[in-house]
């Protein structure tokens, strides 16, 4: 039994992305970079945690909270603490990692799985926040949150599709077989 290198499979023609996928990856790159900024400067009270030593950065957060009175950020609740801790410990490092990978235009199924997991996670957590905003009739804030609901949902669908197509191509292509019998 001969084992074919996974590196050879991942670099084969089935993993070359069409132009539309490259455009989507560019959109995802800018989404992750902007979400990193939003997480650090608005969502997470990092400057308060650091004792106000970076007060110039907390101005954006103070402006947002005083202008829009976002109940997700203003009214404490245990479930919100859980969401914000996942944003700090899971999403922020992920944003940095995935942005670097997308900038290099990586065509790696591991990246696709990671973005799929993120997309499902971000969609479900934002969905919960949208329900609270809907109950409070905070329409303007809902419009701010909507891209963080729609884009992760699209990412999950897109990455799931990429993975399914690559699995079908790997299964049907003769050079893409993981194992093959040698004569």
Curated annotation (Swiss-Prot):
Residues 47-81, 132-138 are lumenal. Keywords: Endoplasmic reticulum, Membrane, Transmembrane, Transmembrane helix. It is found in: Endoplasmic reticulum membrane. Pfam families: EBP. Signal peptide: none annotated. GO terms for cellular component: endoplasmic reticulum; endoplasmic reticulum membrane. Residues 1-25, 103-110, 160-183 are cytoplasmic. GO terms for biological process: protein targeting to mitochondrion. It is a multi-pass membrane protein. The chain crosses the membrane at residues 26-46, 82-102, 111-131, 139-159. It comes from the Eukaryota. Residues 24-156 form the EXPERA domain. Its main location: endoplasmic reticulum. PANTHER family: SIGMA INTRACELLULAR RECEPTOR 2. Part of an import route for newly synthesized mitochondrial proteins termed the ER-SURF pathway (ER surface-mediated protein targeting), which retrieves mitochondrial precursor proteins from the ER surface and reroutes them to mitochondria for efficient mitochondrial import. Acts as a quality control factor in the ER, promoting the proteolytic degradation of nonproductive and extramitochondrial precursor proteins in the ER membrane thus removing them from the ER surface. Belongs to the TMEM97/sigma-2 receptor family. This is Efficient mitochondria targeting-associated protein 19.
């Amino acid at each position: 039994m001969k084992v074919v290198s996974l590196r050879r499979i991942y670099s084969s023609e089935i993993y070359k992305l069409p132009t539309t996928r490259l455009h989507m990856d560019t959109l995802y790159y800018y989404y992750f970079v902007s979400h990193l900024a939003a997480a650090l400067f608005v969502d997470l009270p990092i400057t308060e945690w650091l004792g106000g030593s970076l007060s110039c950065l907390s101005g954006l957060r103070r402006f947002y909270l005083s202008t829009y009175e976002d109940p997700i950020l203003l009214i404490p609740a245990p479930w919100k603490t859980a969401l914000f801790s996942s944003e700090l410990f899971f999403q922020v490092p992920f944003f940095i990692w995935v942005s670097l990978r997308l900038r290099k235009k990586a065509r790696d199924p591991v990246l696709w799985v990671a973005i799929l997991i993120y997309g499902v996670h971000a969609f479900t957590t934002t969905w919960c926040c949208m329900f609270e905003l809907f109950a409070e009739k905070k329409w303007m804030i809902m419009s701010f949150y909507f891209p963080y609901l729609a884009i992760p949902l699209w990412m999950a669908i897109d990455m799931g599709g990429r993975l399914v197509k690559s699995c079908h191509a790997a299964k049907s292509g003769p050079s893409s077989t993981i194992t093959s019998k040698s004569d």
